[in-house]
């Protein structure tokens, strides 16, 4: 990249470009030149690779050719969307001066910076996903973390105590862009994340952060927001807010508060649990067959985003949960009438953010008008229901009749995409605008009359009057009749088969029309800006309305799902335990073609651990996950897939289910498994729900069994957590004999010959066998391998017959115990078959059979 050190050697235009580029050295600069945004030097090379556009040259400056790439201004949003998805940031530099009045290069300045975490344009956002900007800070006392959704104004802060909690927050929020300080020491936490931005340490200063936030909120202190005593979170929030202001280059009036999120307010889930439960993303990274995909019947994008936030942060406040349940119950008979109204409301939340940023387009305001038009009917519908649960939401949604009437008067029915296209403001809204438009719109009548008059006067049947953007108005005559035009016809353009002329009368009219069009467009832009000034004083009430409408959408969607899938209202109890009758897995039951086998679950103070045995593919993991998902659904206020459910207090959900190598961190499958297990043993409490699936598989049989045994003992005796413990170690089925509160259950299966039928039903007691060979045969393992495995199994079972392997809590026993002496084997060894008569051989067979 050419620097600003030798500016005088460059052309004036390149001097201007280099000065602007020096202010934004680390991001791409889109430099407006006419109908294109151009990129030069290294920016051009990068953009050509990232966007797959041509790399060319634009003359030379300072004696060197200038690499150049460009994109048309009318298609810039598509290119910006691609760059944002790649984690790139772009400075948009516009022409702000008048080219006609400029003696040198047209005046330009950077008007906005588009970054992955601060985009608000509809075309650049995924409509049903939050798009978060985040900042992280670390101190010896823990972490500070803040997130901002600039497309809604939602500003959150937290203080995770350790690296595991911080990792869980990063996974929950999944920021599009993450700001971190220069001296950040826990890079392993964030180095794999997208959109990393290294920031100087001074941007995280505590006093600067307090000043920034008080200035933004118009307050003297931050005690009202609950963040005054959270210095780590404040540092992160201060850096984040300053970055947002720097990139947006405008006021941010829609950011009116910051909320402190505290772990004790919700059910805590670590990163592994969120991943294993597939809440909003499946294990393959997609969104199909997730809990969100099943539960999301929202008809607005803002409702869909709210539901995903609820799923990632289930709450523990029983009163708040019961209010949601009451609302769902009240909405059940209203679904068919309410959802069409909410669908018309659209994504009001993001429209309001663009209004606050003064970047809302005409169609945004038209959609806002449609949303306002639904509110009277919606209020009537909710009022007729007379539900106390719905009354607060109805109040917050409100009505905006005056604003609706303003937009009905001000905007045409279907406005164009951009204000600069004209035709946004409705006729009758402003008298002067109507006058200028009448003058411009009268052009076609005038041109028709002029064409008829000149054609008749001159007798030229090929004469016609037209207009194009380059040459303006013209009179066109065919080449064959061009010698007949009068002397006052001045040639303007020569075509292959025609000549185009201008006459003084037409030139005068052209000036008048173009002036009127320009004045009409300028006035229209002014009136459009004034609409922002009329709407923005109501921003706080409008944002409150959007939040209430989004919640109504979520609750009506959950009501629709409860009605369609046969969910029941769970009872939230103060007593420890989980009791579910005929529970079903909410996702699996929608994927299966055959009926889902429902199963019960009972956990209580006296029944804290279930040791679950049964065959692979028998349904152990499904049963465990379904328990966690039903508990989680109950804690977002949803109805649940069961005949009856009573859910006691739950503070955390842990899952140690499945594992894979973490190659990026250099950790084996077993290391990943043990790390997750350690987290559970350190952090689980008596109110935690713990799912442990096949602990100890990744090491030797002795080590694995010992670890599984010790973990089960710790969870049952020391921690007393509510635990579902699936295992293939049958030695663990003796735990109920040794520990209080531990019970055996198993997934049933029927074996017939070499085939197996999975019953998927949970029964009391331990499984009789693991059916491993039958499952292997079902999976397509070659018959000769299965045959050899059966032979080897018989050998091993014979060798270990009558062994004491169930005493796994005693001394460690060898895997293959030494075989006991066999009388039949000794007798067989002593027989010489060559000297036996047939009668003697038959006698020996009977004797040997008797010895077995």
Swiss-Prot record:
Keyword annotations of the record: ATP-binding, DNA damage, DNA repair, DNA-binding, Nucleotide-binding
One Gene Ontology term from the biological process aspect of the record: mismatch repair
GO molecular function terms listed in the Swiss-Prot or TrEMBL record: ATP binding; ATP-dependent DNA damage sensor activity; damaged DNA binding; mismatched DNA binding
InterPro entries named among the record's database cross-references: DNA_mismatch_repair_MutS (IPR005748), DNA_mismatch_repair_MutS-lik_N (IPR007695), DNA_mismatch_repair_MutS/MSH (IPR017261), DNA_mismatch_repair_MutS_C (IPR000432), DNA_mismatch_repair_MutS_clamp (IPR007861), DNA_mismatch_repair_MutS_core (IPR007696), DNA_mismatch_repair_MutS_N (IPR016151), DNA_mismatch_repair_MutS_sf (IPR036187)
Pfam families: MutS_I, MutS_II, MutS_III, MutS_IV, MutS_V
Keyword Repeat: no
Signal peptide: none
One GO CC term on file: cytosol
Family: Belongs to the DNA mismatch repair MutS family.
Function: This protein is involved in the repair of mismatches in DNA. It is possible that it carries out the mismatch recognition step. This protein has a weak ATPase activity.
HAMAP family: MutS (MF_00096)
NCBIfam families listed in its UniProt record: mutS1, PRK05399.1
Protein name as annotated: DNA mismatch repair protein MutS
Lineage: Bacteria, Pseudomonadati, Pseudomonadota, Gammaproteobacteria, Enterobacterales
The encoding gene: mutS
